Amino acid sequence: MNFNKRFASVHNVDVLLGHENYDYKTSGISGLRIGQAFENIYQFSNFGTINSLGSSFSASRSEGFFSRVNYDYNGKYLLSASFRRDGNSKFPTDLRWANFWSIGLGWSLEKESFFASVPWVDQLKLRASYGVTGNSNTGNYPYQAGYDIGWDDDTRPGIILQSLGSPQLTWETQKPLDIGLDFGLFKNRLYGTLGYFYRNSSGLIFSVPQPLQNGGTPSGSFTVSQNIGEMVNKGLEAQISAVPVRGKNLNWTVTVNATRYTNELTKMPEATPALTSSPFKREVGKSIYEFYTRDYYGVDPQTGSALYKGVLNYSPTNSQLIKNKNGGFDTVTIDHNNARQDYVNKTSLPDVYGSFANSLSYKNFELGFVITYQIGGYVYDGVYASLMSTATNGGTYHTDILRRWQKPGDITDIPRLDNTRSSQFGATSDRFLTSATYFSINNVSLAYRLPKAFLSAINATSARFFISAENLHFFTKRNGMNVNGNFSGQTSDSYDAARVINAGISVNF
């Protein structure tokens, strides 16, 4: 429901009230039978033995009541306030409802009388906002213990405990502060926005490894979702557009935007001061995007074994001292389980990222392109790592495997192929950290608008020929499949975005 009203020619009020409700359900069924009786008949009845049957069901609900009030005084002073109450079935009954709000202020300075003598300023608006938002991005039943059914013997049904519940789990909350400046200068030949943001997140939901008495494992694979941390994100963002040429026949606009931000974990519980999940470690004072892993030293030229710098326990059977370039000695090991892990001074966060767009028109021709970029940051290229390990069962190698160690005396950074040592030679380490810097030609387009004289002859209001290309090329050092990673610092087994070329004509009558 929406209400807007203008009072006394200078007061403008807009009020919004709303309600939303979502019901999410997913289900699936699967089956496998073997022993085909007749060829080319794929119905279950044509197979003699049931190998497996399975099914799944999951559901969650969310509901929200929200409101928003916008007010401005003659377009000069602006106020915006919002409030919402949200509930989500992912949390315990007494913790699933929470209140969230925000307030924003704006001041259009160019409308003040003291700016009347500054004709080259078309827009100059200061704005700021602050509030509380919530995040429910977790599984559907994290607060409840989970059981896996179907563990039957010959005569009795059986179940096993699959996960422990987290009865105190609740919303993550974030308190965002935004301060910005919108400007337009020289008859809007130069315009854009500058901004600073600060996000204080609390009640972060982490998967916490459980102690052995809770069913935990030495590897830490048994976890429970808990609200245990606080984190700060802060940074700067800018978008600036310029119009170098503005005329009757020729127009040219250039837009550049850039964002830079930092991240720091500011609080962890005393009982769990650090969480290690290779290749990261979560602890106070560090970024959750900072890599924590083994230091890959190279390859032993005599044996072809992978070497890792720093050992937990020195052993002559798997450790050795190697003289370094500075005349000192480095302690290395061939046993990845005995290799020390530490921060490697690399993060998945870029120094800066953004895009560059260009639009040029001359008479009836239009040309444009968009380039996105990221400068700095690293990614753990797990896809590349999988392509550099032993390719059993029909697996695939990366062409870099041709540079592997093959005989004593070979100098290379790729260890020998050895089925019995693949876990050691391909262990998680900074060997697979790759620069995430990239430049991408996202879009290029060319169009021609038919002149009015021709349009009148065919009784058309407009006609336009066009050709465009998307995802033309990625410039990157990445070696895995999909070269466009993300700030999580991990990769996935997915192909590059498809290169698409479109051409056509658009006519309106």
List PLM regions with ranges.
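Active-site loop/lid in soluble adenylation, ligation, and acyl-transfer enzymes
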Residues: 2, 110, 345, 349-351
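Extracellular/periplasmic, surface-exposed regions of secreted and cell-surface proteins
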Residues: 2-288, 428-509
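Short, positively charged
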Residues: 44, 331-335, 420-422
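Extracytoplasmic gating/loop element in the C-terminal half of outer-membrane beta-barrel translocons
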Residues: 88, 374-464, 469
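Conserved small-residue
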Residues: 226, 232, 245-348, 388
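Short, flexible active-site loops
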Residues: 338-340, 352-353, 365, 424-432
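Glycine-rich, aromatic-lined ligand/substrate-binding cores of catalytic
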Residues: 347-380
